């Protein structure tokens, strides 16, 4: 009599971690596509972020997954992979000192310009779910209540199409909107079932779009202020330096740049920027016009 055959153990998709070689390939794609740096010791992080993608695609191993994302058919999945490897964390009025500077030093001149028919452009670069851009919008509406009826626009961009869609929906749960001061909640947030939605004026100010900061930018006009916070921490030093230079080229003279609490922009003689506050910089060249 033959011995019973043990059942074959089938590992669920994504349960086997990437090999060192596969991790190196994933890191190379992330760096080439988006300038993101993944350290060699981040295998468990990569597995935890990408396992759900392998499960969704029914792929048992990272070799098969890599073959797919490198193929022409895998272009969209390549973008999803990049999105999964970054952390989409944002809060309303995060690092509030930036919004105080924005309110007290940036907006008075911009509001006066808009009132006289001038153009105002702002950018939330790496906007995540939209909280930063809508914090900018609420602060702007406090300074200029009819801003949405003037030539004033906020661009909110992110590499992740899913967070861009959530930002465009402009709907958040009670916990998410809790950092919004009560007076602003009453003015700019409307009940939407169990959630809250930004009012029409705030939504009208913000345009969301997918944008890879590491790729070409389609925008032609200059910005008066750029918020790019806790984004370049994923980049290596050369990619960071290149991005600061590109922001300098995208800002109007005297334009403002706000970065994350752990990020620093070279400032002073020989650089395009001067320090204007905590993690706040201003492009040289006179007052914004």
List where the protein language model places each region:
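Conserved AdoMet
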Residues: 2-123, 260
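Residue-level signal for inorganic ion chemistry
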Residues: 102, 226, 251
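Extended basic-aromatic, gly/pro-enriched interface segments that bind polyanionic ligands
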Residues: 125, 146-227, 231-242, 264-266, ...
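Conserved SAM-binding loop of SAM-dependent methyltransferases across substrates and taxa
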Residues: 129-147
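Core SAM-dependent methyltransferase catalytic element
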Residues: 225, 266-289
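A short glycine-rich, Lys/Arg-flanked "PGG" loop and its adjoining helix->strand segment in the class I
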Residues: 241-253
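Conserved beta-strand signature within the Rossmann-like core of class I S-adenosyl-L-methionine
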Residues: 254-261
């Amino acid at each position: 009599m033959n011995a019973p055959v043990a059942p074959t153990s089938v590992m669920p998709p994504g349960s086997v971690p990437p090999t060192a070689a596969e991790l190196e390939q994933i890191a190379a794609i992330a760096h080439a596509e988006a300038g993101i740096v993944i350290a060699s010791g981040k295998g468990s992080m990569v597995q935890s972020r990408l396992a759900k993608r392998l499960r969704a695609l029914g792929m048992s191993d990272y070799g098969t997954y890599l073959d797919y994302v490198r193929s022409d058919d895998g272009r969209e999945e390549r973008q999803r992979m990049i999105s999964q490897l970054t952390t989409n964390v944002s809060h309303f009025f995060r690092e509030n000192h930036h919004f105080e500077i924005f309110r007290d030093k940036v907006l008075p001149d911009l509001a006066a310009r808009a009132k006289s028919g001038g153009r105002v452009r702002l950018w939330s670069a790496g906007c995540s779910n939209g909280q930063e851009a809508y914090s900018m919008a609420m602060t702007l509406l406090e300074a200029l209540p009819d801003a949405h009826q003037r030539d004033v626009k906020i661009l909110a961009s992110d590499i992740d199409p899913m967070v861009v869609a959530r930002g465009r929906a402009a709907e958040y749960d009670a916990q998410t909107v809790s950092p919004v001061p009560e007076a602003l909640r009453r003015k700019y947030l409307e009940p939407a079932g169990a959630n809250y939605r930004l009012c029409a004026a705030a939504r009208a100010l913000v345009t969301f779009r997918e944008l890879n900061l590491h790729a070409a930018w389609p925008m032609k006009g200059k910005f008066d202020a750029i918020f790019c916070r806790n984004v370049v921490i994923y980049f290596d030093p050369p990619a960071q330096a290149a991005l600061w230079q590109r922001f300098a080229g995208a800002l109007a003279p005297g334009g403002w740049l706000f970065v994350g609490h752990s990020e620093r922009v070279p400032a002073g003689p020989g650089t395009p920027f001067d320090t204007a506050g905590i993690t706040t910089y201003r492009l040289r060249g006179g007052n914004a016009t």
